[in-house]
From Swiss-Prot:
The keyword Transcription regulation does not apply. Keywords: Cytoplasm, Glycosyltransferase, Purine salvage, Transferase. The gene is apt. It is an enzyme of class 2 (transferase). This is Adenine phosphoribosyltransferase. It catalyses: AMP + diphosphate = 5-phospho-alpha-D-ribose 1-diphosphate + adenine. GO terms for molecular function: adenine phosphoribosyltransferase activity.
Length: 197
């Protein structure tokens, strides 16, 4: 990751390097062992969201990275990607597009199926969610296998948008998602990396 500073409005000093900010945020991510199943170390971002200082620092990291990038929209993946994605869109004065699980959107949709470890799932987007040529930032909370984010990328591209980058708070590189996304042509930015899954 490259060095970055935090805005003067942030509670973290402006001279802080991104590495320091990463450590600060990482310390506030709760690890819940054996949830939702035995052997999984669940990375819980809710402590970051509950604390106003941590939330401000987190949002500032994304806002500073993407301001001035000529974006038209931010798309967030159901459900935790909605939280960060909508705040970042607001801060950048952009619209927000939800990418939902199948059957949750009321208007005409475009769907994309993706593989899970034992089966498949589908995400959808409204058919009028973006226009050809739109430059879109795609956000989720965590990158594990990368399947959901890759499906979101394909949906946006089918509508003619360019996905400028995928972004998440947490990367679990051992699960292969970040490699899958980058190999699939999606540049990726994550704030924290954790070993295991």
């Amino acid at each position: 990751m490259t060095d970055a500073s935090i805005s003067p409005s942030s509670p973290v000093p402006a001279s802080t390097e991104l590495g320091d900010v990463t450590r600060y945020l990482r310390e506030r991510i709760r690890t819940v062992p054996d949830w939702p199943q035995l052997g999984v170390m669940f990375r819980d971002i809710t402590p970051l969201l509950q604390d106003p200082k941590s939330l401000r620092v987190l949002v500032d990291v994304f806002v500073h990275r993407y301001m001035g990038q000529g974006l038209n929209l931010v798309a967030g993946i159901d459900a935790r990607g909605f939280i960060l994605g909508s705040i970042v869109a607001y801060e950048l004065n952009l619209g927000f597009v939800p990418i939902r699980k199948k059957g949750k959107l009321p208007f005409t949709t475009v769907a994309e199926e993706y593989m899970l470890e034992y089966g498949s799932a589908t995400v959808e987007i409204h058919a009028d969610a973006c226009k050809p040529g739109d430059r879109v930032l795609l956000i989720d909370d965590l990158i594990a296998t990368g399947g959901t984010m890759m499906a979101g990328k394909r949906l946006l591209e089918r509508l003619g948008a360019t996905v400028v980058e995928g972004a998440a708070i947490v990367d679990l590189p051992e699960l292969g998602g970040s490699r899958l996304l980058m190999d699939g042509g999606l540049p990726l930015f994550t704030v924290c990396r954790f070993d295991g899954h």
